[in-house]
Swiss-Prot record:
The record marks 111 as: Important for acyl-CoA specificity. It comes from Brevibacillus brevis (strain 47 / JCM 6285 / NBRC 100599). GO terms for cellular component: cytoplasm. The keyword Glycoprotein does not apply. Pathway: Amino-acid biosynthesis; L-methionine biosynthesis via de novo pathway; O-acetyl-L-homoserine from L-homoserine: step 1/1. The record marks 192 as: Important for substrate specificity. It is an enzyme of class 2 (transferase). Keywords: Acyltransferase, Amino-acid biosynthesis, Cytoplasm, Methionine biosynthesis, Transferase. Its main location: cytoplasm. Belongs to the MetA family. This is Homoserine O-acetyltransferase. It catalyses: L-homoserine + acetyl-CoA = O-acetyl-L-homoserine + CoA. The active site is at 142 (acyl-thioester intermediate), 235 (proton acceptor), 237.
C-alpha cells in the first residue's frame, strides 16, 4: 500500500521516480480505507532532505500512511523557505486537538547545547507531553531520542571525546522483539553525533530496556516496556551520501574532522561509499509501523482512551 502525500510536495516526485508507492491526495480521497496518521516533527535545518529520507522508508511498507509534517513555531528556520513551511507544514497549535497513530521526532544539530538552552525547548516539552496522550507509538531519532529520554526519564546525555561518525556494527540484546523481525544478528547503522546516552544511566530506569547496542557506538535502541516510546541514537534513515556530505561540509569549514569510519573502501574519501544499512532501515520502519502502530492503534482514534 502507498504513502499518501500532497501532490506538490517535492518528495512526492522524487519517491515516485524511485518506484516507492506514492499515492497523491487526489487519488487517495476515493479509497474507502483509513490510512495510518503519522505526524513527523522535523527538527532538522534542511527539512526537504530529512522529510524525503523518512518518507522513503514509510512508503516502502504494505500500509497506507497519511503524513502530517510539523515544525516548531518558536524557531525561525534559516535553511528551509517560509514558502515550503507554509505549504506543507503545520504548527503544534494547529494539530494539538488531533490524535495520531504514530509520531517521528527527528534529530537536530543542537546536541552540544544544554537541553534548556535550545530556543524551542519549552515548545518541545509541550509536544513531548502531548504525544503521551494523543499518539499510539513514537519513534525518537538521535537528538530527538536524547531529548525524549531526558524529559520523560531524566536520562542525561554526555559529551564524547570525539565525534561518533561512521557506520558501526550492532547486535541485538533481546530476541523475539517485533521491532527486529527479519534482522540479522549483526547489522550496520550510521551514527553522527557528539554526545551519547550511557548504558548505566538507562539501566537505572525500570521502565526502559536497551534492545540493541554496539561495542563501538554504544547504546543504539532503547524502548519503554510497552513499546509506545522508542529511542534510536543512530540514523538508519540516512541516504548513501549523507555522511559524505557532512564530512565535506566540515572539511570545507576547516574543521578537524576524521573520515567517517567503515564508510569508504579503505577509508579513501575519493571512492564511492559502501551502503550496508539500507535493508535494516526498511525493516525497522516497516516493523514499527506494523507491530507498534497498526496492530496497536484503534480504528477510531477519537475513542482511544490512554
Amino acid at each position: 500500500m502507498p504513502i499518501k502525500l500532497p501532490d506538490e510536495l517535492p518528495a512526492t516526485e522524487i519517491l515516485a521516480q524511485e518506484n516507492i508507492f506514492v499515492m497523491k491526495d487526489s487519488r487517495a480521497f476515493t479509497q474507502d480505507i483509513r490510512p495510518l496518521r503519522i505526524v513527523i516533527l522535523n527538527l532538522m535545518p534542511v527539512k526537504e532532505t530529512t522529510e524525503t529520507q523518512l518518507l522513503r522508508l514509510l512508503g516502502n511498507t504494505p500500509l497506507q500512511v497519511e503524513i502530517v509534517l510539523l515544525h516548531m513555531s518558536s524557531h525561525t528556520s534559516k535553511n528551509t523557505s517560509e514558502e515550503h513551511l507554509s505549504l506543507f507544514y503545520k504548527t503544534f497549535e494547529e494539530i494539538r486537538d488531533q490524535r495520531f497513530d504514530g509520531m517521528i521526532i527527528t534529530g537536530a544539530p543542537v546536541e552540544q547545547l544544554e537541553f534548556t538552552d535550545v530556543t524551542y525547548w519549552q515548545e518541545l516539552t509541550e509536544i513531548l507531553d502531548w504525544k503521551m496522550e494523543n499518539v499510539t507509538s513514537t519513534l525518537h531519532i538521535c537528538w530527538g531520542a536524547q531529548a525524549g529520554l531526558y524529559h520523560h526519564f531524566g536520562v542525561q546525555k554526555h559529551p564524547l571525546p570525539e565525534k561518533m561518525f561512521g557506520i558501526f556494527p550492532h547486535t541485538l540484546n533481546k530476541q523475539n522483539v517485533k521491532l527486529f523481525r527479519g534482522f540479522d544478528n549483526y547489522f550496520h547503522i550510521p551514527h553522527s553525533r557528539h554526545t551519547e546516552n550511557r548504558r548505566e544511566d538507562i539501566e537505572q530506569v525500570p521502565e526502559l530496556e536497551i534492545l540493541s547496542e554496539s561495542d563501538e557506538a554504544g547504546v543504539y535502541i532503547v524502548a519503554t516496556r510497552d513499546g509506545r516510546q522508542i529511542f534510536v541514537t543512530g540514523h538508519s534513515e540516512y541516504d548513501p551520501t549523507t555522511l559524505q556530505d557532512e564530512y565535506q561540509r566540515d572539511v570545507n569549514k576547516g574543521l578537524d574532522i576524521a573520515v567517517p569510519r567503515n564508510y569508504y573502501p579503505k577509508d579513501d574519501p575519493s571512492r564511492e561509499p559502501i551502503v550496508t544499512w539500507r535493508a535494516h532501515a526498511n525493516l525497522m520502519f516497516s516493523n514499527w509501523l506494523n507491530y507498534y502502530v497498526y496492530q496497536e492503534t484503534p480504528y477510531d482514534l477519537n475513542n482511544d482512551k490512554r
